[in-house]
Amino acid sequence: GSCAVVTGMGTVNADNPRLNARLTEPIVQPLRVIIDSKGQLSSKAALFDVDGSVLVASAGPRRDKSDAFDSRTESITLPDGSGRVDLAALIDELGRRRCNEVLIEAGAGLAGAFAAAGLIDELLIYLAPDLLGSGGRGMFALPEVVSLEHRLRFEVNQVKQLGRDLRVSLRAERWKA
């Protein structure tokens, strides 16, 4: 399993996830990392209802200083100069903490930011054989590619059927042997 699971405030606000592994056998829970650029995370979020450590990465101070986190939560400030969290600095920090396998479970905005920064080694895509139409959400919010030489390239690593769904593993082409 992953050493850390990372998500952003869009996912916290939309889904209120716990971000813990729910397996039958006991395991060490991953470090739950919340990217909270604007310091808006509430101590009432569901992720604080379960055991395990939480790391909150922000670009500046918290807005509501009276809404204190408990002792399981550490806050770090990693500004990128444009009001967002410096994602490369966050990955470096997780590496210093010996978190070498990090799961990004996020919406299109944060997933796109990690992809655009070249911080994705592998994509695990779960694909259902259902069409949602034009109202369906995209996986990555990325700038338009003006020429194919600037596209993000991946190699198919593995395709596995899980019931009706497919699990597709893609590796970033820069890691090609």
Annotated model-derived regions:
Residues G1-N100, G109-G112:
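Active-site ligand-binding patch in enzyme domains
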Residues G10-V12, G107-G109, P129-D130, W175:
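Short glycine-rich anion-binding loops that position phosphate/pyrophosphate groups of nucleotides
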Residues P61-R62, P143-A177:
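Conserved histidine-centered catalytic loops in small-molecule metabolism enzymes
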Residues P79-S82, P129, K160:
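Structured beta->alpha junctions
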